[in-house]
Design a protein with these regions (language model features):
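Post-BTB helical module
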Residues: 155-216, 317-395
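Ankyrin repeat domain, specifically the short helix-to-loop turn at the C-terminus of the second helix
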Residues: 20, 32-40, 66-69
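Ankyrin repeat start-site detector
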Residues: 1, 46-47, 325
């Protein structure tokens, strides 16, 4: 390719020529970078086949075929999705089994009731009191039933194209109009793609969750768990069914005299603290008088208001945080081993950053190991360093951070100072910005000299 011709076309605004050259840009290094950072090209899926068809060289095509990547879900980047998938696959604390033409599927009544009005009705009528439910109808395909369960639990579905019609039939029976629409839309996409790209083979349809609907419906279980006297003001969802379906609780948490009817599957799956607590606690525990089969566990050192915030996080991966409660929730999240809730608190604290609290926020981030919040604090410090160096508390923080470095020598670096210097000098591109950065660095160096530190 003539580089001069390309540059001339760019200057002239010859878009058609630039587009022609761009189609030749098959950079193998870029493909490797994308794959290493979570991009995926799954064989026999619609998106995967489209990606393979569009490969610009044989080397890239081979790279896509041979790359054994761990997907974002397998790497547990989204802990909530991973928890729900594990709950489905392992069936821990399941309270119902479906037998479909010789195949057994473990499930949880609470999840199916929250996600489907059809299952809610069936559990209270035809299937009431049954722990093993045989589904003998010849048109019920086990693979399609498994895909429907996957959709209930995760909002996602992976289904062989040969089973799509079976899935749609089941979805119709379960009154899942939205799922039918999604399947038909995806089938149309695949048909149009395969028609225009001969030689491609799509064997698996994948539906990805495109909204928070399944989280909102799981939050109904938190609504149900609330004691009647505390329900006013909480759990106000657009389509509130909490008065119309039982949630089948198997554990009662008593907090400040209030009884929260919950599920071991969620609390044990979300928190190792509760997992250990519930597995070790009940040899001769207290039982509820109204529900003799439900054990009671009294939780101390937490207010019922903060427990409610934890409750909604456990069920829906989200909760309402405010400047008034975020520090208390953060302490509870740390104590109950809920790293996702800690990160949620970190995001809320980051929105509260100001000159008056940045030093306290940095200490909080260090204490609770919130690396993202810690970095945001040092970035904020870099912006106001000329005023910050005048505060004795800031000098004390630097001394303390220097003292935390094991076997530190006089000229060794100090993590806090290094991070501030990085943010001062990053993205400096103009002469005026360089001058401003130098003034800030001089102010920081002068403070270090005053307190007798070098780094």
């Amino acid at each position: 390719m003539d580089a001069y011709d390309l540059f001339t076309s760019c200057r002239k605004g010859d878009i058609s020529r630039v587009r022609y050259y761009s189609c030749l840009c098959g950079h193998e290094e870029l493909v490797q970078y994308l794959l290493a950072n979570g991009a995926k090209c799954e064989a026999n899926t619609f998106d995967g086949e489209r990606c393979m068809y569009g490969s610009l060289s044989d080397s890239i095509r081979r790279l896509l075929k041979e790359y054994k990547c761990i997907t974002a879900q397998a790497m547990q980047r989204d802990y909530y999705d991973h928890f729900l998938l594990t709950l489905l696959e392992q069936g821990q604390y399941s309270d119902v089994k479906f037998l479909v033409h010789g195949e057994t599927f473990q499930a949880h009544r609470c999840v199916l009731s929250a996600r489907s009005e059809y299952f809610t009705a069936m559990f209270e009528t035809k299937w009431k009191g049954k722990n093993l439910i045989p589904l003998k109808h010849p048109l019920i395909n086990p693979a399609a039933f498994g895909a429907i369960l996957q959709y209930f639990y995760t909002g996602r579905m992976d289904i062989d194209v040969s089973h799509v019609e079976d899935c749609k039939r089941l979805a119709k029976q379960c009154k899942m109009g939205d799922l039918i629409d999604e399947l038909e839309s995806k089938c149309k996409q695949v048909y149009e793609f395969v028609s225009n790209k001969p030689g491609t083979c799509v064997k698996v349809l994948t539906l990805e969750p495109h909204s928070c609907q399944h989280q909102e419906e799981m939050a109904q279980l938190a609504d149900c768990a609330l004691p009647a006297e505390l329900k006013v003001g909480f759990g106000e969802l657009p389509f509130d069914r909490t008065d119309n379906f039982p949630s089948y609780p198997d554990i009662c948490f008593r907090v400040e005299g209030y009884d929260f009817l919950c599920h071991k599957a969620f609390f044990c799956g979300r928190s190792d603290y509760f997992k250990a607590l519930l597995q070790d606690h009940f040899s001769e525990g207290e039982m509820m008088q109204s529900q003799p089969s439900t054990p009671v566990l009294t939780i101390h050192n937490i207010s019922h208001e903060i427990f409610i915030r934890l409750l909604y996080y456990v069920y829906s991966d989200d909760t309402e945080l405010s400047p008034e409660n975020v520090f208390d929730v953060l302490c509870v999240a740390d104590m109950y081993l809920l790293p996702g809730l800690k990160r949620l608190c970190g995001k809320t604290l980051a929105k509260m950053l100001c000159e008056d609290n940045v030093l306290h926020m940095w200490k909080t981030a260090k204490l609770f190991r919130l690396s993202r919040l810690e970095d945001q604090c040092t970035e904020y410090m870099a912006k106001i360093i000329e005023r910050l160096v005048e505060k004795p508390e800031f000098a004390d923080m630097i001394k303390e951070d220097a003292g935390a470095v094991e076997d530190r020598h006089e000229t060794d670096s100090i993590p806090l100072v290094d991070d501030i210097r990085f943010h001062i000098t990053s993205n400096v591109q103009t002469f005026s910005a360089i001058e401003e950065a130098n003034v800030k660095l001089d102010a920081l160096d002068q403070l270090l000299s005053t307190i007798g530190l070098e780094c």
